[in-house]
Amino acid sequence: MIKLDMTILDSLKENKALRKLLFSGHFGLEKENIRVTSDGKLALTPHPAIFGPKEDNPYIKTDFSESQIEMITPVTDSIDDVYNWLENLHNIVSLRSKNELLWPSSNPPILPAEKDIPIAEYKTPDSPDRKYREHLAQGYGKKIQLLSGIHYNFSFPEALIDGLYDEISLPNESKRDFKNRLYLKVAKYFMKNRWLLIYLTGASPVYLADFTKTKQEEKLRDGSSALHDGISLRNSNAGYKNKESLYVDYNSFDAYISSISNYIEAGKIESMREFYNPIRLKNAHTDQTVESLAKHGVEYLEIRSIDLNPLEPNGISKEALHFIHLFLIKGLLSEDRELCENNQQLADENENNIALNGLSKPAIKNCDNEEMALADAGLLELDKMNDFIQSLRPEDTYFQAIIEKQKERLLHPEKTIAAQVKEQSATAGFIEFHLNQAKTYMEETEALAYKLIGAEDMELSTQIIWKDAIARGIKVDVLDRAENFLRFQKGDHVEYVKQASKTSKDNYVSVLMMENKVVTKLVLAENNIRVPFGDSFSDQALALEAFSLFKDKQIVVKPKSTNYGWGISIFKNKFTTEDYQEALNIAFSYDSSVIIEEFIPGDEFRFLVINDKVEAVLKRVPANVTGDGIHTVRELVEEKNMDPLRGTDHLKPLEKIRTGPEETLMLSMQKLSWDSIPKANETIYLRENSNVSTGGDSIDYTAEMDDYFKEIAIRATQVLDAKICGVDIIVPRETIDRDKHAIIELNFNPAMHMHCFPYQGEQKKIGDKILDFLFE
């Protein structure tokens, strides 16, 4: 077995900066899932149109089949970030694949006849990507192409390579040659020891009987087949391999390039893309030819042998990602040993033996053809990992715990992923087990559909439009996280967006007018659009003196320039001087000027207008609780606020009901307190204004709303030259009174999340509508 390279280890021990860099890197993932129907059959629908042409979307493509979706993360600087990206892509694809599920196994679901398996479609029939897939279908068959998995792309930090180059490079060795040699060394280690990775991550021991046959299989009660003691059909000789073994020369980078070129010239493979090695040396240039690799050198490694783990929602655990990273670090820190053709054959035998018989703990052969017990061989490698962790990062208990878990799996095969998958498939059936997993994961995705993992600290509307941009393959940069300021880029087209709806389409003066409610009302009224009459005050004493003008009227007291319904008090019934003064105190706490205006009876609706079209209408019900005759108002609020969809600061679709001065005032107007116990089924309103932002409930009314009011909303936005605008209209309950409506506010930064995830009714794709407006 391969020893640790003490030259590198000693250099790292003496250099704290290099030690830190060793455990970092650049990470990217590619994941394939087959789209299936609710009964586990290959979905024959086209690739979802929302993702756009496959050539143009860097994140969401297809692999071989039109039904085989591929998710590609960008390169990140941490495993946490790449895992979040994978989870977000998985969620986006799941939610956009209507009435379909993502099949969680590497082994295919129920397939149609070979001729009916659709090859991925591209912009033109003669696309190189289409031609390549037709070549594969002819050479290997379509069914075998549907084996799916995860590709793990990794590179060491350039600063680490630079530091090691200064410390341990050979005389007269260029930086490029050193880097190529380093990655080649890691690849050799991987090829020799990949059996261990397959044992620990393999997850495809069960498959449908009509997919393939193996000598080691047993029949399960549902008629599916399982490898008797196997780990991974996909990584076995029955999986997806080149037609014949291709042994490349690992003695030098130039020899590696030459041997692949020779296979291409001999017609063994069409191009480097068809070199189905478990690990490939790659660079970031998109043509991915052997000539490009020779010219630019190695920039990263691509590991291709990772099965989809059906026990994980995203197909792989964060723990597995960390272990693979440690595995590659082990390759860097190991002695550079020859990987001749004979050694490659032994490595292939070990891989196939583990893939087909791993649960029976077969012996592992070393390069001298000597056998070692599986557990002993595996523990030897894991102990060396522990050694360099203890030596270079002794404080890291997380990595040590990961190694200990892998040891448990080595000593107890029943704890492997493969054993668990086989057991559960045997109990429920191959199709039923994987369908249940897929449905469970879909339910979990739907429950958090509003969320962008890793951006939970940002406004919900920002998360939504960011997710919708990813779906379209639009590049997103965060310019100012606290301000929710993003940059979207599609090709050469760049858009800057703040808080999801402040865009380049905004007119600055329009924003200023909408920000000032007095100006808004004045301009609308001058254009014969009905608004409530009233007055504004900058002096609280003068506002208080005006009590006699308003005391017998239904009125609204609100700040002049606030948003989200904050600081608003509504009096529909008789009110006292004290009530009036408290309302002024609240309003002046939000602004230096307040408006006192008539209360318009009716229901409040939010009309979302984008580019002169009403895209959504929402009825907003004021914050309320329903009594049960047992609990107090305060207790009922606490219970309603436990809804997982309720949060604060617009981070969830609904806002928690507050227990502040506005709510206390509203209760007092009903002769109630927080300790009052409402009757069963009695609705108690805690707010007069119906903003969702203050704990109200949202109900979609887009289809039901009269076009008469939609036209009024559009006209109001046209008057102020507003392109993305929330128009709040009080609509009378009786049709005969519709002329008694009034616009009470125009919002230049309307929240979209309440339309996307209403309390009741149809969810609207507002992020898509804004992106359409910006980019099309």
UniProtKB/Swiss-Prot annotation:
Protein's UniProt keywords contain Protein biosynthesis: no
Pfam family, one: GARS_A
Amino-acid positions noted as binding ATP in the UniProt annotation, renumbered to this chain: 548-606
Reactions performed catalytically: L-cysteine + L-glutamate + ATP = gamma-L-glutamyl-L-cysteine + ADP + phosphate + H(+); gamma-L-glutamyl-L-cysteine + glycine + ATP = glutathione + ADP + phosphate + H(+)
Cofactors (names): Mg(2+); Mn(2+)
Domain ATP-grasp positions: 521-775
Region described as Glutamate--cysteine ligase: spans on this chain: 1-354
Residues annotated as binding Mg(2+) 2: 745, 747
UniProt: Mn(2+) 1 binding residues: 728, 745
Annotated positions binding Mg(2+) 1: 728, 745
GO cellular component: cytosol
Presence of keyword Magnesium: yes
Enzyme superclass (EC): ligase
Cofactor detail note: Binds 2 magnesium or manganese ions per subunit.
EC number annotated for this UniProt entry: 6.3.2.2, 6.3.2.3
InterPro entries given in the database record: ATP-grasp (IPR011761), ATP_grasp_subdomain_1 (IPR013815), Gln_synth/guanido_kin_cat_dom (IPR014746), Glu_cys_ligase (IPR007370), Glut_biosynth (IPR006335), Glut_cys_ligase (IPR006334), GshAB_ATP-grasp (IPR040657), PRibGlycinamid_synth_ATP-grasp (IPR020561)
Binding site for Mn(2+) 2: 745, 747
Recorded metabolic or biological pathway in which this protein acts: Sulfur metabolism; glutathione biosynthesis; glutathione from L-cysteine and L-glutamate: step 1/2; Sulfur metabolism; glutathione biosynthesis; glutathione from L-cysteine and L-glutamate: step 2/2
Endpoints of the signal sequence: none
Record keywords: ATP-binding, Glutathione biosynthesis, Ligase, Magnesium, Manganese, Metal-binding, Multifunctional enzyme, Nucleotide-binding
Cited function: Synthesizes glutathione from L-glutamate and L-cysteine via gamma-L-glutamyl-L-cysteine.
Subunit organization: Monomer.
NCBIfam families in alphabetical order: glu_cys_lig_rel, PRK02471.1
Protein name as annotated: Glutathione biosynthesis bifunctional protein GshAB
Source organism of this protein record: Listeria welshimeri serovar 6b (strain ATCC 35897 / DSM 20650 / CCUG 15529 / CIP 8149 / NCTC 11857 / SLCC 5334 / V8)
